[in-house]
Structure formats: C-alpha cells, structure tokens
Design a protein with these regions (language model features):
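NUDIX/MutT-family hydrolases
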Residues: 112, 121-155
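Active-site-adjacent beta-strand/loop module that shapes the phosphate/pyrophosphate-binding cleft
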Residues: 39, 87, 96-120, 127
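Short secondary-structure junctions
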Residues: 83-90
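Conserved N-terminal beta-strand and adjoining loop/helix that marks the start
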Residues: 14-44, 65, 96
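Short, low-complexity, intrinsically disordered N-terminal peptides in bacterial proteins
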Residues: 1-29, 156-164
C-alpha cells in the first residue's frame, strides 16, 4: 500500500471547506491515514476532535498524519495505538479524498479496518460513538461527510447521512 497514491484507481476529488476564508499559498499537502473501523453489525466508529485542535468537538474517523518514511498502513497502526489504544490486525485501502481547509490542505487516505485487538481508550480526551446511518452525533467534520456518502451508496441507504 503506497502512502501517496489513491486507494482505488479513481480520480481524487478536492473538497473546499469555508471557501470564503483566506488560505496561505505555500501550504504543503499533508498526508493523513484514516481508519474506518467497522464492527460485525456494520456500525462504525466516530471520535470527537480534542480541544486545542482545529475543529475541536467535531466528529470524525480516527487517524493521523504520516511520519517521514511511513506507509499509510504503518501510520494508521501507529496512530490508532497512540490515540485510541487499539492494535489493528489488518486494513484495506479504500478511498482517497483531498480536503482544502483554511488551515491545511490534507489528503485523507481512508482504510477499512474490521479486525483489531484491545479495548478503546480515548487517550486524547476525545469522545467516541459507534454509529449507523444516519449518524446522530454532531457536528460532523467536513472530511467525514464523503465517507458517509460512500457508506450510503455501498449499503443502498436512502436518506440523510446525518440526522437532523
């Protein structure tokens, strides 16, 4: 699994968030490994962003930035151990999306994770919730919304992906 190529041979979509806000012209693209943890009942894990981070309190799939020389799978394994205390047994590269936030330009490399060991421990004082469509936690991070749309398509779900 490469750390810079899309997970699937599809074009990478760029989504712009808060387009009216200024952006620095010299922002580097930040590679992020994102774990989409799915239980046997098809519920998926969302965690809240910790205080002190951009979009604190928003709900997202757990993950984090790649370090120099890491693959997506290596970064995901490290980040999920550091942030939520689990060890992933395997992951499947799934989708890739670029999000242009005012504070950062990120490439989100989503991986499905169905097998892990350990109990969830929110090591950054974040909250967690196992969700189904439509998700009931709010607010949802803009970078998370495409995943909910992909789930809806895969699961033939019709309706809002985030409850009103």
């Amino acid at each position: 699994m490469s750390s810079t190529e899309p997970a699937i041979n599809e074009p990478i979509t760029v989504r712009v968030v808060d387009a009216q806000l200024p952006r620095s012209a010299d922002r580097a693209l930040v590679q992020v490994a994102v774990g989409v943890l799915i239980r046997s009942d098809d519920s998926f894990l969302l965690t809240s962003r910790p205080e002190g981070k951009a979009y604190a309190g928003y709900w997202e799939f757990p993950g984090g930035k790649l370090e120099v020389g890491e693959t997506i799978a290596q970064a995901l394994k490290r980040e999920l151990q550091e942030e939520i205390g689990i060890t992933i047994e395997d992951c499947m590269s799934w989708k890739t999306e670029q999000i242009d936030y005012p504070h950062a330009l990120v490439q989100l490399n989503f991986c499905k994770v169905r097998r892990w060991s350990g109990e969830l421990q929110m090591r950054e004082a974040q909250l967690y919730a196992w969700q189904q469509l439509p998700v009931t936690v709010k607010p949802v991070l803009p970078g998370t919304l495409p995943v909910l749309e992909w789930f809806a398509k895969e699961r033939s779900f019709v309706g809002l992906t985030v409850a009103e």
